[in-house]
C-alpha cells in the first residue's frame, strides 16, 4: 500500500473543475454523499467540491439500499454519485418503484466500469421516474484526487468515459514508452493537470515510474490503464493492465466479458477473472449473479454458455460459470474481484496438496 501525497491546490482545482463541467449546479443544491470520506471520490467530489461551491452534503453514515433511498426521497437530493453496484441496487428496490426523481440534476458513476447494459437500464429508470438527465460516467484515480474525465452534460457515446476536465490533458501512449499512438489505437492512458499528486510517500522509485516528464515539459501520470481516444477527444477505458487475463498468448479483458454477460436477460451482475493454468498460463472463469427467480442450474449455465460462444472468440470462452447469490464487494461498493481470485488460488493449492 502506498500513501498518495495530495495538496490543497489539487483539491481546490478539482472543485473548480466539477463546477465547470456541471453548469446546472446552483448554491444550495444537495449531494447525497454515500462514498466514504477516506476515498478520493467521496472526499473530493461528494464533499469538498460541493462545500467550496456553496452546496449541501447529505451524509450516509451506513449504507443500505433502503437507507439510501429513504434519504434521497426525504431530502429531494439534486446530485448523486456512486459506483455501478449502487445503481444496480436502486433498480431492484421496491421503495423506488413509484419514486419521483424530477429533483435530480446529476447522476454520476465512477470507481468501477459501468456496463453499457446497466447504463441503458438506469437511464430508462430515470426517464420513467421523471428525471430529465442520464447517468454521466467518469474516470479517474487517487493519483489525481479522483475524477479527471467525465461524460458531457446531455451528450454521451456508448462505452466512453467522456472528455477530460478543463485544464486536464489526456494522451494514449504505447505501454512502457512515452510514444503517443494514433486516435482509435489502444494504449496506456496518461493524464496531466492541476490535480496530479506530488508523489507516493517514501516511494521515490514508484513515483518516478508513475510521474514522467514528457517532451512537452508536462508531468504525466502513467495510469497503468488501457484505453483509446477518438478524434473528438472522447476517451474509452478498456481495462486495468493488472486485471487483464492472458490465456494461450491472447489478451482477454474482464470488463468486456462482464459487459457481454450483463447484457443477457437472465443476468443481474457478473465478474470475470483469470485462474492460473499450466498449459494456458491463465484460463477464464465467470461468476454470475442471476436475476431474481432464475434457477441456478445446469440448464441456465448451458443457456449462458451458448450465448457467450456467439459473442466472444474461442480463446476467451470461460471454462466454468459459477453462480453466486451475491458477489463480494469492497468497502466502496465495487465488486471485489481479488477476493474471487484468492478463493480460486486457495482451491488450486488444496487440490495440489491432496494429490
Residue positions per predicted region:
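Conserved AMP-binding/adenylation subdomain of ANL enzymes
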Residues: 12-30, 38-79, 93
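Gly/Ser/Thr-rich phosphate-binding loop
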Residues: 77-82, 91-160, 169
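Phosphopantetheine-dependent thiolation modules in NRPS/PKS and related acyl-activating systems
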Residues: 334-355
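Conserved ATP/PPi-binding loop(s) of AMP-dependent carboxylate-activating enzymes
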Residues: 163-167, 177-212, 252
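AMP-binding/adenylate-forming catalytic core of the ANL superfamily
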Residues: 80, 193, 198-199, 209, ...
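Short beta-strand->loop structural element characteristic of the AMP-binding/adenylate-forming
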Residues: 3-5, 33, 55-62, 136
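Phosphate-coordination loops involved in phosphoryl transfer and adenosine-cofactor binding
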Residues: 27-28, 104, 132, 186
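Conserved AMP-binding A3 loop
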Residues: 1-16, 151
Amino acid at each position: 500500500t502506498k500513501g498518495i501525497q495530495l495538496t490543497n491546490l489539487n483539491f481546490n482545482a478539482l472543485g473548480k473543475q466539477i463546477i465547470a463541467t456541471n453548469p446546472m449546479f446552483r448554491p444550495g443544491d444537495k449531494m447525497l454523499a454515500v462514498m466514504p470520506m477516506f476515498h478520493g471520490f467521496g472526499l473530493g467530489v461528494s464533499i469538498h467540491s460541493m462545500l467550496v461551491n456553496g452546496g449541501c452534503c447529505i451524509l450516509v453514515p451506513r449504507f443500505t439500499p433502503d437507507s439510501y433511498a429513504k434519504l434521497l426521497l426525504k431530502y429531494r437530493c439534486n446530485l448523486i454519485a456512486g459506483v455501478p453496484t449502487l445503481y444496480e441496487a436502486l433498480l431492484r428496490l421496491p421503495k423506488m418503484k413509484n419514486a419521483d426523481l424530477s429533483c435530480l440534476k446529476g447522476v454520476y458513476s465512477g470507481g468501477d466500469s459501468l456496463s453499457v447494459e446497466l447504463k441503458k437500464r438506469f437511464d430508462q429508470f430515470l426517464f420513467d421516474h421523471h428525471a430529465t438527465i442520464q447517468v454521466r460516467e467518469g474516470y479517474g484515480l487517487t493519483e489525481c484526487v479522483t475524477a479527471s474525465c467525465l461524460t458531457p452534460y446531455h451528450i454521451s457515446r456508448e462505452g466512453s468515459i467522456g472528455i477530460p476536465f478543463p485544464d486536464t490533458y489526456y494522451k494514449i501512449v504505447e505501454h512502457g514508452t512515452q510514444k503517443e499512438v494514433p486516435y482509435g489505437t489502444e494504449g496506456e492512458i496518461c493524464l496531466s493537470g492541476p490535480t496530479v499528486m506530488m508523489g507516493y510517500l517514501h516511494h521515490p522509485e514508484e513515483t518516478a515510474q508513475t510521474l514522467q516528464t514528457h517532451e512537452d515539459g508536462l508531468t504525466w501520470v502513467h495510469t497503468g490503464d488501457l484505453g483509446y481516444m477518438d478524434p473528438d477527444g472522447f476517451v474509452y477505458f478498456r481495462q486495468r493492465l493488472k486485471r487483464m487475463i492472458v490465456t494461450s498468448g491472447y489478451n482477454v479483458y474482464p470488463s468486456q466479458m462482464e459487459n457481454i454477460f450483463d447484457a443477457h436477460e437472465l443476468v443481474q451482475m457478473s465478474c470475470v477473472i483469470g485462474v492460473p493454468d499450466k498449459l494456458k498460463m491463465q484460463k477464464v472463469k465467470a461468476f454470475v449473479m442471476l436475476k431474481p427467480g432464475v434457477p441456478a442450474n445446469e440448464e441456465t449455465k448451458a443457456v449462458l454458455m451458448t450465448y457467450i460462444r456467439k459473442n466472444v472468440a474461442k480463446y476467451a470462452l470461460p471454462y466454468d460459470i459459477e453462480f453466486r447469490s451475491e458477489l463480494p464487494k469492497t468497502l466502496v461498493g465495487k465488486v471485489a474481484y481479488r477476493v474471487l481470485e484468492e478463493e480460486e488460488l486457495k482451491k488450486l493449492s488444496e487440490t495440489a496438496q491432496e494429490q
